[in-house]
Swiss-Prot record:
Role summary: Nucleotidyltransferase involved in the post-translational modification of proteins. It can catalyze the addition of adenosine monophosphate (AMP) or uridine monophosphate (UMP) to a protein, resulting in modifications known as AMPylation and UMPylation.
Binding annotation for Mg(2+): 257, 266
This protein's name: Protein nucleotidyltransferase YdiU
Organism placement in taxonomy: Bacteria, Pseudomonadati, Pseudomonadota, Betaproteobacteria, Rhodocyclales
Family classification: Belongs to the SELO family.
Superkingdom in the source lineage: Bacteria
């Protein structure tokens, strides 16, 4: 690996706050070089967030740097250890099996850690090759940035770097890696690891690190660790509410894939809801349907129970740890979900019966299965006060999503009756709804089409999707084709944990 002085431009100096923890928490090691790397896609928004110099972005060495082939100034690469529950079963020790934390950058926009996912074997690889493939790396890159555009808390992605190195999965694919960016990558499973080993000292060291680095306000609480658990519970509730509101399904909500910062983490077999089915399984490795759309709020709460159990040695009143989760998570999820759904439905002010109306709406969607994203986007354009032929003409695009149009008309009548209870200028309401209901989401078929071209070294669709998904609530008529229903060829697409 080349030394930092070989870099073409001055690079912001890294620090690695996680490396200040004892070495039991990680293994220091350098990324394994990726031969002859090349750039597949770059998020200039994330580059700006990091304050990367333009000369570096345009440099031929950029791919070498973010393939892990060049050491960055101040970088102390490491792979972290953690454990976790996978599909509801204790899996024991896991860890960064192919991710290398390069370090962090601090600027006026915050503290940002950069992690290379797919940078080679670590002591936690459990026999795997430590690589990621082009397919999964493009999916994670695009979805990270798409979720940011949607306003959902998420890790970010700076770039995808590819190589022609073959790797074996279900078939031979080519290696790639994604440079992930977040304030931190500590997981629920990071705490479970030490709790499962009765290592209270390390458990407290980790909690202190999280408080001091990310949540200093917790230090002023009567019990800082109880405050931290409640903070994580609240942020997780808000996160899951955002997922549900945009129709996002994570696909593999294991405790090692849950961020203590309330961020969407580890994009694998994810999906966005199309024809609405609350029982949809987006991960074909999820044979029991544990991670369906409807189950996500319950699974997140179960994961928080696992975290609360890990926190027990730190709490003054351990007997109420799960009660704290129930109260904090439950309230945060319910309040955030109601607020987001009221915005999607154009309800100016929440009324006591809105929870029932929202529930009835989801029952209606379940029965008739329109496309989730198109339903709410087209609803956003409807008037609350037209009559007769004018209303029928305005309603036609939404009604076209239904076989049973009489049922659609009946629901629309109920919706308009609810709108009348909190009057709002039609134009203002429509603008508000359009800002709450995206036109564009990263449908699996869109990602698949871009991946197929990328395998032929054509990355134009990766860039086109990235550009579009930065502003998913804007009309962007030049991207109308990306808002279409899935084509026939996409009906058999499946995604799994293989990456």
């Amino acid at each position: 690996m080349n030394a930092p002085e070989s870099l073409p431009v001055e690079f912001p100096v890294f620090d690695n706050s996680f490396a200040a923890l004892p070495e039991a928490f990680y293994t220091r090691l350098e990324p394994h070089p990726l031969p002859e790397p090349y750039v597949v896609g770059v998020s200039t928004e994330v580059a700006d967030l990091l304050g990367l110099p333009a000369e570096l972005m345009n440099s031929p060495q950029f791919a070498e740097i973010f393939a892990g082939n060049r050491l960055l100034p101040g970088s102390e690469p490491l792979a972290a250890v953690y454990s976790g529950h996978q599909f509801g079963v204790w899996a024991g020790q896991l860890g960064d099996g192919r991710a290398h934390l390069l370090g962090g950058l601090r600027n006026d926009q915050g503290h940002w850690e950069i992690q290379l996912k797919g940078a080679g074997r670590t002591p936690y690889s459990r026999g795997a090759d430590g690589r990621a493939v082009l397919r999964s790396s493009i999916r994670e890159f695009l979805c990270s940035e798409a979720m940011a555009g949607l306003g959902v808390p998420t890790t970010r992605a700076l770039c995808v770097i590819g190589a022609d190195q073959p790797v074996r999965r279900e078939e031979i694919e080519t290696a790639a890696l994604v440079a992930r960016v977040a304030p931190g990558f500590v997981r629920f499973g990071s705490f479970e690891h030490w709790a499962s080993r009765d290592r209270s000292r390390e458990l407290q060291q980790l909690a202190d690190y999280v408080i001091d680095t990310f949540r200093p306000a917790c230090r002023d609480a009567e019990n800082p660790y109880d405050a931290l658990l409640r903070d994580i519970s609240r942020r997780t509730g808000e996160l899951i509410a955002h997922w549900m509101a945009v129709g996002f399904m994570h696909g593999v909500m294991n405790t090692d894939n849950m961020s203590i910062l309330g961020l969407t983490l580890d994009y694998g077999p994810f999906g966005f809801m199309e024809a609405f089915d609350a029982g949809h399984i987006c991960n074909h490795s999820d044979h029991q349907g544990r991670y369906t759309y409807r189950n996500q709020p319950h699974v997140a709460q179960w994961n928080l129970y696992c975290l609360a159990d890990a926190f027990l040695p730190l709490l003054k009143h351990p007997d109420i740890s799960r009660v704290a989760v129930d109260e904090t998570y439950g309230d945060a999820f319910a309040q955030t979900f109601e607020r987001l759904m009221c915005a999607k439905l154009g309800l100016r002010h929440a009324l006591p019966d809105d929870e029932n109306f929202i529930g009835e709406t989801f029952g209606f969607l379940q029965q008739h299965r329109p496309d989730f994203t198109l339903f709410f986007r087209r609803l956003s354009r409807l008037s609350g006060g037209l009559d007769g032929e004018a209303m029928a003409k305005a309603d036609a695009p939404l009604r076209d999503l239904f076989v049973d149009r009489a049922a659609c008309d009946a629901w629309l009548a109920n919706w308009r009756a609810r709108l009348a209870q909190t009057p709002w200028d039609d134009g203002e309401r429509q603008a508000s709804m359009l800002a709450a209901n995206p036109k564009y989401v990263l449908r699996n078929w869109l990602a698949e089409a871009a991946i197929r071209k990328a395998k032929l070294k054509d990355y134009s669709d990766v860039q086109r999707l990235l550009t579009c998904l930065r502003r998913p609530y804007d009309e962007q008529p030049e991207f109308d084709d990306l808002a279409a229903l899935p084509p026939d060829w996409a009906s058999g697409l499946e995604v799994s944990c293989s990456s």
